[in-house]
Every structure is written in C-alpha cells, then in structure tokens.
Amino acid sequence: MTNVSGVDFQLRSVPLLSRVGADRADRLRTDMEAAAAGWPGAALLRVDSRNRVLVANGRVLLGAAIELADKPPPEAVFLGRVEGGRHVWAVRAALQPIADPDIPAEAVDLRGLGRIMDDTSSQLVSSASALLNWHDNARFSALDGAPTKPARAGWSRVNPITGHEEFPRIDPAVICLVHDGADRAVLARQAAWPERMFSLLAGFVEAGESFEVCVAREIREEIGLTVRDVRYLGSQPWPFPRSLMVGFHALGDPDEEFSFSDGEIAEAAWFTRDEVRAALAAGDWSSASESKLLLPGSISIARVIIESWAACE
C-alpha cells in the first residue's frame, strides 16, 4: 500500500522481473544426475542471439527438451521447476516455428514484453537471458584467461585443469526518484533519448561505495542537486546484460539550480504530481504518443516507482 505521506512512500506493486513464479530448485544445480533425470519430461526455453523468445497469450512458449537432445547439452542452463514439478532448461538457439497456426506466437525480447507475461514466464526469461548473456562473454577465465566450461547446471564456469570456479557477474546500479516531499518530482532526459522522453536518474555503484552514497553522488554528478534522506524502495534484475537495479527515493530542493556536467543528461525538470499522472494515463513510451511527457515502459522498476509516487495523496 502506498503511504499517503509525500515524504515517504512504498512501491504499489512488485516490478515484473522481480516476481517469483517458478521454483529455482537450486539444490539440483550441484546434483547434475538428479537435474538430468528430469530432462526427458523437461520443458525447453529457446533464447535466440537477439535475446528474443516466443510468446503467445501472455506466456512464454516452451518446447520439449527431449526434442533437442537425449540429455542436457553442456551449454544448457537449468532454470528450475514450474507447477507440477516439471524441469525447465534454457539454451541459446534459433526459435522454432509453431506448427499450430491458431497460436498467435511472436518473437519478443525482454524489453518488449511489458505486462503481457505472467510471473512464471517473466522469471524464466529474465534468468535465462542473464545466464546466457554471461556464458556468451565468460568462456575464458577472468583470473588467467584459461578456457572454462559450464558447471552447476549452467550457474557457474570452471577451469577444468585448476578447478577454479567463476560465477555470473552482476553489476549493481541505483535508480532514484528525487522529490520535494510535497507535490513535485525530478525527471530527466538522457542526451540519447528523443524529445519528451523522461525517466528517473540512475547510475552504477562504484567500488567501495554504499547504495546510499551512490545515489547522492550520481544525482550530484548528473544534475547538480544535493539530496538527503535517501530511502530504499525495492529492486529488480535488469539483464541488459547483467544489472541489478536498486530503487530509492530522496528529498531534493526545487530552489537549487540544475547543472549538467557529465554530458549524460540533456535536461531535467520538476514535474507536478498531476503532470505525472496525466503522462501515466497516456501509456508507455511511444514516439507516436501525443503526451507532452513520455515515461518508462511497464517492465521497468522506474515505472513502478513513478506510479507509486504519483499515487500518493
């Protein structure tokens, strides 16, 4: 529930990619025999080179693993179990055409899925994208450059000679809504974005830095504001290719002037709650929209944070 106070509020909903819909069954990652035993009846998620999957009627389309091979290939990653205990694996492979013409299947990447997916599908696609992206770029050890091979059912890679094991890298980043504690919030437009497209301020956490310190530093660097009372809201995996977005809100002073020193931000402005509500009512980002303010798509934690603040009274 959203707090009615303008100074503090909570997320009204869990971001799509943060929802839990499948059992990760992580114990099976170290018991490859047990994981492989479920292969004959397992489901297979194909993710192509453009990180697209097949989706129909709000669900990701899963094939039969046994049609790919009689056992899990080395490059397959184990995603867990869905309802009924069925195992699900993912591979980087071309998408298979659907034989049934009555199934309205389309190839969509994770950014374009929006709210068309159920919780289980979003979790499976998010995990598969993150893991497969990592495997694509981690075939050699970060320690000594030696070739590595998949282990733990795709959740790590090992140097077969030394036994050195490496795990998927995650890059934490903060994302923050700056508001005045009353009726206004800051939204900014990156230099690479079209006119009217605004979102929250975000940036990667540096070595030796806390999330809260990162929030203050990034906002100061990007728009020149000094913020205080930084408060945590929630988090969301963002596998593009390997980020974890950690959401906050913080107080800022509308009388302080903006400054843009690092070149990332083209403009920033204070928007009233009514202006944001009107933009939300107009829908997701779209250059064809007639809205004066275009906001992030529904898949992002930025959208959920903005919606939650806008709902405050």
UniProtKB/Swiss-Prot annotation:
Binding positions for a divalent metal cation 1 per the UniProt entry: 202, 222, 264
Cofactor(s) this protein cannot do without: Mg(2+); Mn(2+)
InterPro entries from the UniProt entry: NAD-cap_RNA_hydrolase_NudC, NADH_PPase-like_N, NudC-like_C, NUDIX_hydrolase-like_dom_sf, NUDIX_hydrolase_CS, NUDIX_hydrolase_dom, RNA_Hydrolase_NudC, Znr_NADH_PPase
Residue numbers covered by motif Nudix box: 203-224
GO cellular component term of the entry, any: cytosol
One example GO MF annotation: manganese ion binding
The Nudix hydrolase domain, residue ranges: 168-293
KW Cytoplasm (keyword) present: no
Annotated cofactor note: Divalent metal cations. Mg(2+) or Mn(2+).
EC annotation from Swiss-Prot or TrEMBL: 3.6.1.-, 3.6.1.22
Biological process per Gene Ontology, one example term: NADP catabolic process
Reaction it catalyzes: a 5'-end NAD(+)-phospho-ribonucleoside in mRNA + H2O = a 5'-end phospho-adenosine-phospho-ribonucleoside in mRNA + beta-nicotinamide D-ribonucleotide + 2 H(+); NAD(+) + H2O = beta-nicotinamide D-ribonucleotide + AMP + 2 H(+); NADH + H2O = reduced beta-nicotinamide D-ribonucleotide + AMP + 2 H(+)
Family the entry assigns: Belongs to the Nudix hydrolase family. NudC subfamily.
Protein's recorded name: NAD-capped RNA hydrolase NudC
Organism: Mycobacterium bovis (strain ATCC BAA-935 / AF2122/97)
Biological classification of the source: Bacteria, Bacillati, Actinomycetota, Actinomycetes, Mycobacteriales
Gene name, Swiss-Prot/TrEMBL: nudC
